[in-house]
């Protein structure tokens, strides 16, 4: 019991000193030590991208999702969202490359298939969009209907 109390006291003193010493150094003309900066995580960048996407700020979303896949190249969802953001900035060919990467990582990814099909529609490559549609119909009927509507209307 006494060891536990001593440990808690020592931990409290260490915490207090870690808070006070940088302030006293600054007060006496010294510079406070910079706080350690944790590297950005792929998830943090992905979440920033989702916020930018929700705000319809697709250029920022592109940058955020790119950072996410740079940090973690195996992040299929980030590749898919990167494709979505690229498509919404008119960069259809680059969007297709992002969707291809998402599908390499997760071959039966309905959302990536739908978005890829929509990018093909935007590029006027309707035969390729229909090929994607056939594959998507086996995986997700609702997304397949959305893609079918895009093919029909050319949007």
Predicted feature residues:
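Alpha-helical segment of the N-proximal tetratricopeptide repeat
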Residues: 40-71
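Canonical tetratricopeptide repeat
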Residues: 47, 81, 115, 149-150
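Conserved structural position within tetratricopeptide repeats
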Residues: 69-70, 100-104, 137-138
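Position-specific recognition of the canonical hydrophobic site in helix A of tetratricopeptide repeat
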Residues: 46, 53, 70, 80, ...
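Helix-start (N-cap) detector for alpha-helical repeat units in TPR-like alpha-solenoids
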Residues: 42-43, 76-77, 110-111, 144-145
């Amino acid at each position: 019991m006494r060891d536990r109390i001593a440990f808690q006291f020592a931990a409290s003193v260490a915490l207090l000193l870690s808070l006070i010493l940088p302030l006293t150094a600054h007060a006496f003309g010294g510079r406070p030590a910079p706080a350690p900066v944790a590297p950005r995580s792929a998830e943090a960048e992905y979440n920033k991208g989702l916020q930018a996407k929700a705000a319809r700020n697709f250029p920022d979303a592109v940058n955020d999702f790119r950072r996410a896949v740079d940090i973690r190249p195996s992040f299929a969802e980030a590749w898919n969202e990167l494709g979505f953001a690229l498509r919404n900035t008119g960069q259809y060919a680059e969007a297709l490359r992002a969707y291809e990467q998402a599908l390499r990582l997760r071959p039966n990814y309905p959302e990536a298939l739908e978005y890829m099909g929509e990018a093909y529609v935007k590029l006027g490559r309707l035969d390729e969009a229909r090929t994607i549609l056939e594959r998507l119909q086996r995986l997700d009927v609702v997304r397949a209907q959305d893609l079918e509507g895009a093919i029909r209307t050319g949007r």
